[in-house]
Regions:
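Class I S-adenosyl-L-methionine
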Residues: 1-214
C-alpha cells in the first residue's frame, strides 16, 4: 500500500490515491487534461498497486486501519489526489474507516454520482469527519458545462474548475448556472491546502469552492 506524504500543493497532508481515469466516471471532462498523468512513473506505479490492492477491500481496509493507528499525529487526510470512488463497496469502506478514526478529518472530491447515490452517502448520513465535495467544470474547448445532477447539487458543496485563460467568460457562465446568491457564497482556493483549509470540513452551508485549472 502506498500513502503519499504530501506534495507542493497540499503541504504535509498525506493521501491515498488510485490511477487516474480508469477509476473515474466515464466521459469526465478532465480526462484529456488530467495533470496526474504527468506525475513521475514511480508515483503512477504506486497508484496502480493501490488499485490492485483495492480489489481486495478487506485487506485494504485492514492495512489502512493499521496505518492510521500507527500515525496518530495525522489530523487531516485526503482520499484521492488521483482517482475516484469506483464502486459502492469501496466508498462504504472509506466511510467505515472515517467512523473508526474520529480524530482524523478525511476529505475528498468526486464525480461518481451513481456510486454516491447507491451508497446512500448523503451528507446527513456521513460521519462529521468525512467531507465529500462534488466537482464541476466550466466549458473547456468543445466541452459544455459539466455539473452534478440536481439532487446531488442541492445537497453537497461543489468545487468549480475554472480555466484561467477564459476566467471572465466562465464566471459569467457559472453565475447563470448556479445563480448570483450561490456564487456570492463561493470561496476561491488559494492553491495551498496546508495554508487554505477550505475543503477540510466543508458542508453545503459553508458555500462552494472555486479552483483554477492546473
Amino acid at each position: 500500500m502506498h500513502i503519499s506524504i504530501g506534495n507542493s500543493k497540499m503541504g504535509p497532508i498525506p493521501s491515498f490515491s488510485l490511477p487516474p481515469c480508469i477509476t473515474c466516471r466515464e466521459g469526465v471532462p478532465c480526462a484529456k487534461k488530467c495533470y496526474v498523468r504527468r506525475f513521475h512513473k514511480s508515483v503512477l506505479n504506486g497508484y496502480d498497486e493501490n488499485f490492485e490492492l483495492a480489489q481486495h477491500l478487506l485487506r485494504l481496509e485492514n492495512e489502512l486501519n493499521t496505518w492510521f493507528s500507527l500515525h496518530k499525529a495525522v489530523k487531516i487526510f485526503r482520499i484521492h489526489v488521483s482517482g475516484d470512488y469506483f464502486s459502492v463497496p469501496y466508498l462504504k469502506m472509506w466511510i467505515r474507516i472515517a467512523r473508526k478514526h474520529k480524530d482524523i478529518q478525511f476529505f475528498s472530491f468526486s464525480k461518481q454520482w451513481d456510486v454516491i447515490r447507491q451508497s446512500v452517502a448523503w451528507p446527513h448520513n456521513l460521519p462529521k469527519n468525512f467531507t465529500l465535495i462534488l466537482s464541476a467544470w466550466m466549458p473547456i474547448g468543445d466541452r459544455d458545462v459539466w455539473m452534478p445532477p440536481k439532487d446531488l447539487f442541492d445537497e453537497y458543496p461543489i468545487a468549480y474548475i475554472i480555466d484561467p485563460k477564459n476566467r471572465t467568460e466562465q464566471m459569467i457562465v457559472l453565475e447563470k448556472e448556479i445563480g448570483t446568491r450561490r456564487l456570492l457564497r463561493t470561496q476561491e482556493c488559494s492553491g495551498n491546502c496546508d495554508a487554505c483549509g477550505l475543503c477540510f470540513h466543508r458542508r453545503k452551508k459553508d458555500g462552494d469552492i472555486l479552483f483554477t485549472l492546473h
